[in-house]
Amino acid sequence: MRLRSSTLCAAAAVLAAAAGSLPCSVLAATGSNLPNQIQRTLDDYLAQRRDIEGVSAIFLHVDLGDPGPIIEAYAGSDGLRDNAPVNGSTLFQIGSNTKHFEAAAVLQLEAEGKLDIDQTVGHWLPEYAAWSHVKIRQLLNMTSGIPNYSETVAIGRIMATDMHHQFANGELIDAAYPRADNVLPVPGGWFYSNTNNILAALIIEKASGSSLREVFKKLFSRAGLHDTFYADGVYPDAVLARVLVGLYKNPECLAYQPVPCEHSTLAPLLGKDMREQNLSWAGGAGAIISNPRDLARWVRALFGGRVVPRRQLQEMTTLVSQKTGEPVAHASEKEPAFGLDLVQAYRAELGGLFWYYQGETLGYRCIFAYWPQYNLVMTVATNSQPPAGTDKLGDFVLGKVLRILADASIIAPIPQTGPR
């Protein structure tokens, strides 16, 4: 779907009115071609990547803070019965972007004196004795050494045969827990594991005395989110009606399948629409439904200090190497870094240092990127999990839009050198 320049400017004006900025005057000063260039980038992504990545729609939000511009653009259709064009009310599964909401919930509890992130799993969840030494901080920065339940054959088989299965948190954790009949490789250094976030969810519920859903609802309200929802399982019809079709297209084997592996445990799901999949398999690790507009609001609120106090935000942005798990001051080109469920990266062609996260479920991808040096937040979402090695959403869309903004002097010229 094409979105004409005048329509894009009008949409930006509506968004800006709520944010207190005046995008159209800024856009006019840069020439009328900027909206068309951004729209063309989305159209090109769909045209070039539709068959490769299995996508049919994309939603982009660009927020340069006060005074703007705020730009929103969409392309493609939702794939539902009426095949309606994607618009500002369309919703996506945002996958592991759920994790930084969860980290914020933990840190808010710390600020309230209800827990300390240097307390251990053993302190809060003594039933998991094998991991009793692991600190909450290590759960959130992925240095716990705990295997990933979502890559196990046991969980994969259930997901492949019953998309509506209601997982309990204990069922997910048990798939990764060491036993004589369940020996998984014990990762060292930094290792990405969804099990960390299921454990953190249990700690949140125990420390707060509330369900994770209720804790998240308070966070959503504090950040001013209107289109963000969490259900540990089946979503209400009113929410699902706004979620577009999302396809599973990735034939790659699960990490813990026996080698050699010819067919993925999840192969029965290939080509299927994952829109109505029960998201209890993801829970606190990845079950939020939202859209790029609300995710940008969240990122602004989080980094603006409106979600957790400054001390806790400093803890959240304290980094370890994604290669070694050891503390680092900042990311470099060869060594991305991880905070408490946040990623910092350095790429010269993407403006130097920036914060980001890419969330992914079996049918959706959603990325946020935040450049403090430009006061720029970009969020984008699309509707597939593509074959391994084919995902070009971030580079194709965010990279091109960043260059468009720089060429239009909306942001400063992009540096070509920096910390490496």
Pin down the residues of each PLM region:
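Short active-site loop at a secondary-structure junction
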Residues: I52-S56, D82-L139, N182-T195, G283, ...
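Bacterial N-terminal signal peptides
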Residues: A10-S21
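Short, conserved catalytic-motif segment at the N-terminal edge
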Residues: P35-F92, K114-D116
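Short, gly/Ser/Thr-rich active-site loops of penicillin-recognizing serine hydrolases
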Residues: T324-E326, Q385-R420
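Short, well-ordered beta-strand elements
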Residues: Y357, R365-Q385
